[in-house]
Design a protein with these regions (language model features):
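Carbohydrate-binding/catalytic loop surfaces
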Residues: 319-328, 368-387, 416-422, 447-481, ...
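Aromatic-rich carbohydrate-recognition surfaces in CAZymes
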Residues: 329-334, 338-349, 353-451, 485-493, ...
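Hydrophobic alpha-helical scaffolding
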Residues: 223, 246-249, 262-266, 270, ...
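Hydrophobic, small-residue-rich alpha-helical packing segments that form membrane-like cores
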Residues: 106, 158, 427, 471, ...
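Anionic coordination/interaction segments
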Residues: 1-333, 347, 352-355, 398-402, ...
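Extended, well-ordered alpha-helical scaffold segments
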Residues: 246-264, 271, 299, 345-358, ...
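Beta-rich accessory regions
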Residues: 128-131, 137-149, 153, 223-229, ...
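Catalytic cores of carbohydrate-active enzymes
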Residues: 151-153, 367-369, 491-611, 650, ...
Length: 785
């Protein structure tokens, strides 16, 4: 039975989500831009733009946590007779006859209609220009002539942009302009009732400082049935210092005029929009699945891949939840983002890996965050997150498996704290150093020291913070801290196995054997000190007491170590892995996924850190953290339980929640970081959508483990793990210049196991399809049984 549509619907053919009401539970946003010029836009045209770095190159202003929400933005004011309105319903809030917002791939179209006048604005950033376009279409659908005034509005920020020129231009004769917010709004007014719009007359104000804006007034006459179009261009031009001025005190606008010339006509704008849409069609073409399941198709083919691109661009920097002023790109975050992005634009993934490695210090520690503009580590947060170095190995291995590009290991990548070290340091050196760093920092049980935290930033076992305002992530004595992480031990085993594969290919057999031994040693340590009888312990605190154990009064079991234990291959042979997953279902399962821990913490404990400062059921304290749910999904497929893997995927999948939007609140087309758990007073509410590690890991879980097509060093592995009722599916996968058309059939209604595989009609043993000449089209038939 189709889902009830509360606020909109998926248009899969157009690759859009169509919002039919402006009053969504929270602003439902989209992103415009693919690389350098980026922006956020909501379904009511709220949002902001920046160049590369939301902190250091913010271009337009946005206010967080204001009432009403989602101000300011990219506004169009329409004055038609006695009515003033916005196509996006805000900020004037005049009730419209019709409203639609179409969020697409790098494009948002906001359309409103009132009294026979229809105004539609298409917002996008061209693929090859550092500018955003507002392409406005005005149509008179009435039987009368119309004389209207149209006002544009954007509010500039310009922080840290001393040598930049930002311009807001149009291709239409204007009736006036304003660049002063005070002049535009007037005294005691807000965005919903600006003086200039109320009086239908721009003041031609010039802002010399304080609150600069960009606004144009355009007068327009329309006959019945007539449509007119105009295009606003908001661009970023950065002049070299020596070319800043054309003459004393006059900015050199040569590059600005060159940019504007590319958008003079509707034909030029249309060509740029078509080029952008073609870019996205090509970007998503590397993996397409046909299956009798709408949630799989829309997430795997469109929205999850798109979210991975957005998350790769921004890490966790700028969203409706992240202000963009305090965080750059995360080391752990960005390495994980690569896992879901590498097949889309592998050359950008390569550059990102080298950039990340170059923020590592010579002792193996990694800056937890770095600024994309400077490519330097962010000292505000610093180092000391024990899992960070290992993610570099995971992302590098994924890149090589996808591309076969072994030259990346020889790429120069210096240490941030040793200037000039890039001359004699390679990426492979960083991978070895990452392994050594974890091995060198072990505690009394032989497990890796947790330092400030591991993947769970809020599990601060060496912090002991009792001072208001003190950061859990940067305070505490990590040098003398003795707390250990079982999860990092499991991640080490996983990373060590990846290193073994890489080194065996490089014919560095002695070192490969050594890493295999270290992986096995750590596996034994986890089984000895990290097993609690039914599940894996989470950690040991500063006093060497277990965290995530039956002996604890709260927080007896954590989700992270259950998933990673299986992914690392620990306890599979003796049933411990299966027991860990069964325990997860028994103690952590919720209707929206699995909660992070149980029982939830109900009081603050300084020896456990920030996790106990959250109310029960929220964030790291027993919410459904969707990110780590994906690890359990993958773990279930490794043990052959496709029904459970799919059940858990459905519970966290946003596409399944549109009919619950008044509870879920976040967008139904992108994954959220967290959903409030059953211990909270408001279970089922999502937070922190878009920019989350859930994006990449959910795509990996669905496409590589449930559908089962994943890159290996020597080809494509076809190893689905699906619910028994699935009869089969078709996948088109582009891999190293070859197109693989894969048909999977499940005649015996099993969950896992390849009974027979035909490659170009010929039987092939195993489940790995080998490499073919670039340009080839390969037909693969897989029979499960």
């Amino acid at each position: 039975m189709p889902q009830k549509q509360l606020y909109g619907y998926f248009d899969n053919k157009a690759r859009e989500f169509v919002i039919t009401r402006p009053d969504t539970p929270i602003p439902w946003i989209n992103y415009i831009g693919c690389q350098d010029y980026l922006g956020i836009i909501s379904n009511t045209a709220g949002g902001y733009s920046f160049y590369r770095d939301a902190r250091l190159r913010r271009l337009t202003r946005y206010h967080y946590n204001v009432i009403p929400k989602d101000n300011p933005g990219r506004y169009i004011y329409v004055c038609d007779g006695k009515k003033t309105w916005n196509p996006g319903a805000k900020p004037v809030k005049t009730k419209l006859d019709d409203y639609k917002c179409r969020h697409g791939l790098g494009v948002t179209v906001i359309e409103g209609a009132l009294n026979g006048l229809k105004v539609s604005t298409t917002y996008f950033v061209p693929i090859d220009t550092n500018a955003e376009i507002w392409s406005v279409s005005v149509k008179n659908e009435s039987r009368k002539n119309k004389e209207i005034d149209l006002f544009s509005y954007v509010e500039f920020c310009l922080y840290d942009a001393l040598d930049d020129a930002t311009n807001f231009q149009r291709d239409w004769k204007i009736a006036g302009f304003d660049t002063s917010r005070d002049a535009f709004l007037g005294r005691l007014n807000d965005y919903g009732c600006p003086d200039v719009v109320k009086h239908r007359k721009a003041t031609n104000s010039v802002a010399h400082s304080w609150q600069p804006i960009g606004s144009h007034q355009v007068k327009m006459s329309l006959k019945p049935g007539q449509t007119k179009r105009l295009h606003f261009v908001l661009g970023y031009i950065e002049n070299p210092k020596e070319e800043k001025f054309a003459s004393p005190g006059v900015i050199n606008k040569k590059r600005f005029y060159e940019t504007i010339a590319a958008f003079k006509t509707t034909g030029q704008v249309g060509a740029k929009l078509k080029k952008l849409k073609n870019f996205w069609a090509d970007a998503l073409s590397g993996y397409q699945v046909k299956i009798n399941n709408e949630h799989v198709e829309r997430m795997a083919n469109i929205w999850n891949q798109y979210q991975c691109m957005v998350t790769f661009n921004l890490s966790r920097a700028a969203s409706s939840f992240e202000t963009g002023v305090s965080r750059g790109l995360g080391f752990r975050d960005s390495n994980q983002d690569i896992l879901g992005f590498v097949h889309i634009v592998p050359e950008r993934a390569r550059r990102r890996i080298i950039d990340l490695a170059s923020t590592q210090n010579h002792d193996g520690s990694c800056y937890h965050q770095y600024q994309p503009l400077t490519k330097k580590g962010n000292t505000a947060v610093g180092t000391g997150f024990s899992d960070d170095p290992l993610w570099l190995i995971v992302s590098t291995a994924a890149y090589i498996k996808e591309t076969g590009d072994w030259t990346i290991l020889d790429a120069p990548a210096g240490y941030q704290d040793v200037p000039g070290s890039e001359k004699n340091t390679t990426l492979l050196d960083h991978l070895h150093l990452s392994m050594k760093h974890v091995l060198d920092l072990r505690g009394s049980h032989g497990l890796p020291l947790i330092q400030h935290a591991d993947w769970n930033d809020c599990l601060n076992l060496n912090c002991f913070s009792n001072n208001p305002g003190e950061s859990f992530q940067t305070s505490g004595d990590i040098e003398g801290g003795s707390a250990e992480s079982v999860m990092v031990a499991q991640l080490f085993v996983y990373a060590a196995k990846e290193m073994v594969q890489l080194l065996e290919h490089l014919d560095q057999k002695n070192r490969a054997v050594e890493y295999a031994r270290q992986a096995d040693d750590m596996r034994k340590v986890v089984l000895k000190h990290g097993w609690d009888g039914e599940w894996f312990i989470r950690a040991y605190d500063h006093f060497e007491k277990p965290v995530g154990s039956k002996v604890c009064d709260e927080g007896k079991i954590f989700i992270e170590t259950q998933g990673w234990g299986v992914m690392a291959g620990i306890g599979i042979d003796d049933g411990k892995a299966l027991s860990a997953l069964d325990s997860s279902w028994q103690y952590l399962a919720d209707e929206n996924g699995m909660v992070l821990n149980q029982p939830a913490y109900t009081k603050y404990r300084d020896y456990l850190g920030e996790i106990t400062s959250y109310p029960p059921g929220y964030k790291e304290n027993a919410s459904i953290f969707c990110h780590n749910n994906t690890w359990v999904i993958i773990a279930e497929t490794l043990l052959g339980r496709g029904d459970k893997a799919w059940e858990l995927y459905k519970r966290i999948c946003p596409s399944t929640k549109e009919d619950k939007s008044d509870v879920y609140k976040c967008e139904p087309y992108c994954f959220a970081q967290t959903i409030s758990g059953h211990d909270s007073p408001g279970p089922g509410e999502a937070k922190n959508s878009w920019l989350t590690g859930t994006a990449s890991w959910s795509l990996v879980a669905l496409t590589q483990y449930i559908l089962g097509v994943r890159a290996e060093l020597d080809g494509l592995r076809i190893d689905p793990c699906i619910p028994p009722e699935w009869s089969g599916f078709n996948i088109m996968r582009k891999f190293r210049g070859v197109t693989y058309n894969i048909k999977v059939l499940n005649p015996d209604k099993v969950m896992k196991g390849v009974k027979k595989m035909l490659v170009n009609g010929k039987p092939q043993a195993g489940n790995i399809v080998g490499l073919f000449k670039k340009g080839s089209v390969v037909k693969v038939e897989v029979y499960l049984g």
